[in-house]
Amino acid sequence: MEVLQASSLSFQLLRRHSRNNLINKFRNPSLPRIHMPRQNIDLKTFAAITPTVACPPSEPEIIPEKKEDKFEWYENWYPVASVCDLDKRRPHGRKVIGIDVVVWWDRKENAWKVFDDTCPHRLAPLSEGRIDQWGRLQCVYHGWCFDGAGACKFIPQAPHHGPPVETSKKACVKGVYPSCVRNGIVWFWPNSDPKYKDIFLTKKPHYIPELDDPSFTCTMTTREVPYGYEILAENLMDPSHVPYAHYGILELEKVKESAKRDREGGHELEIRVGKIDVNGFSAKQVSADYYFVPPYLYYGRITPNTATKAIDVTLPVVPEEKTAMIIFYCIPVRPGYSRLIFAGARNFAVQVDRFVPRWITHMSHNLIFDSDLFLLHVEERKLKDLDWHKSCYIPTKADGQVVAFRRWLNKYGGTQVDWRNNFTPALPPTPSREQLFDRYWSHTAECSSCSVACKRLNALEIGLQAMSLVFVAMAAAVSAPATRYSMVAMAVLSFLASKWLSRFIHKTFYNHGYDHAFI
């Protein structure tokens, strides 16, 4: 499992064909740098091990397991949503590690709250409700209202002079989860037991200083994908798939074709993986350092310098003595589905993001997601009932991080996400390609930038169609041939522009699809 540098999203943002036009190519945003204390880590060149290899290559060292060294999936913070995509005027529904939650802004406490997405009355989803005029979360099924602590404050159907039924514990929201905001992301602790009420004081979500550093620029993207957490994580850690699965999307260094080198430029990768323990692992690739902090975080810091002589086409181009960060928050949603929050930060070309709308950047991000989406969806189903280590042939060092992640998952994570018997082992059936490549519900509807852009461009499309009709009417009303021809030409141009815009809107915000054969 290769680290973040190989991640498709990261490449799309940072990769430039040449360093001189890095700023001009705004659609490929870059990444910032993470402050990590230097550690004396014993790094070993990682080689994957499979039963079919005659001479097993060297393996990363796994720290001997202690009795308590088992990863606890429900004793960690989980990212729910990026703050930039949340609207304080309404509640938002999300599913994280199988738990349906509602995120809403409590204006009395000036804080984001995370509740179980269930009204105690008739179990309707609170995320379909609203924030009332007093700042309470209101269930729109029967109007019950709740404060930031989950206490019921109003039951419209209760007699005004009768017993205060809203004060009953049964009227309170059953799950009020600890929550916080860190690095521009709302987090929650997936256990509503009162003993975890102040868990933030003793255990905090992993912090990346560069995401809050004003000298860095950062762009965030969120996308839900139709494959599970395990497949998502290993794909992000796999740099060698980038020149192939994302061919024609990312601008990679050009390589000279030869008998042993194809047009895509794939080549041998030297990846060194450090010790693996319950807290994850680190890895090194040329001028990039990567870190896996389970269960959700995988990030890399790319810091080239004049001493770096090796060229790696799987790494984004970063100016010398500058830093780029690629940060991935991998969120298990339910079996067969996961969510990714990607943050790309950098301390160069900072002004670009101030002039380029976020939805423009998301166009290329979503195209990267689409380009390997079907591959990963099918791969997950083929691996479902197989032993990964015995079924996959992994003879090269390029898959070092992928193997390291699988070893961590088997050794400490129980081989898969702990769903607590909330789901059956079976994966959901494969939907149609149209549904698989859906962008609207997996991204646009929940993205503050893309949703607004979609509405405005739809309005522009309608405006162009109306203009076409107006020009036709004007052409019929005038008698001068030259003026009539001009009106007809304008009507045709307006109609063609509306058709082009309609196709652009559909491919950008609703459904794009992908066919590798003709790229």
Curated annotation (Swiss-Prot):
Binds 1 [2Fe-2S] cluster per subunit. Keywords: 2Fe-2S, Chloroplast, Cytoplasm, Iron, Iron-sulfur, Membrane, Metal-binding, Oxidoreductase, Plastid, Transit peptide, Transmembrane, Transmembrane helix. Fe cation binds at H241, H246. GO terms for molecular function: 2 iron, 2 sulfur cluster binding; chlorophyllide a oxygenase activity; metal ion binding; monooxygenase activity. Pfam families: PaO (PF08417), Rieske (PF00355). Gene3D superfamilies: Naphthalene 1,2-dioxygenase Alpha Subunit, Chain A, domain 1, Rieske [2Fe-2S] iron-sulphur domain. Pathway: Flavonoid metabolism. This is Flavonoid 8-hydroxylase 2, chloroplastic. A motif (Redox-active motif) lies at residues 447-450. GO terms for biological process: flavonoid metabolic process. Residues 77-188 form the Rieske domain. The record marks N235 as: Plays a role in the stabilization of the metal coordination. Glandular trichome-specific expression in leaves. The chain crosses the membrane at residues 462-478, 485-501. It is an enzyme of class 1 (oxidoreductase). Signal peptide: none annotated. Its main location: plastid. It is a multi-pass membrane protein. It catalyses: salvigenin + 2 reduced [2Fe-2S]-[ferredoxin] + O2 + 2 H(+) = 8-hydroxysalvigenin + 2 oxidized [2Fe-2S]-[ferredoxin] + H2O. InterPro entries: Cholesterol_7-desaturase (IPR050584), PaO (IPR013626), Rieske_2Fe-2S (IPR017941), Rieske_2Fe-2S_sf (IPR036922). It is found in: Plastid, Chloroplast membrane; Cytoplasm. Nevadensin is a selective inhibitor of human carboxylesterase 1 (hCE-1), a key enzyme responsible for the hydrolysis of a wide range of endogenous and xenobiotic esters. The keyword Cytoplasm applies. Residues 1-46 form a transit peptide.
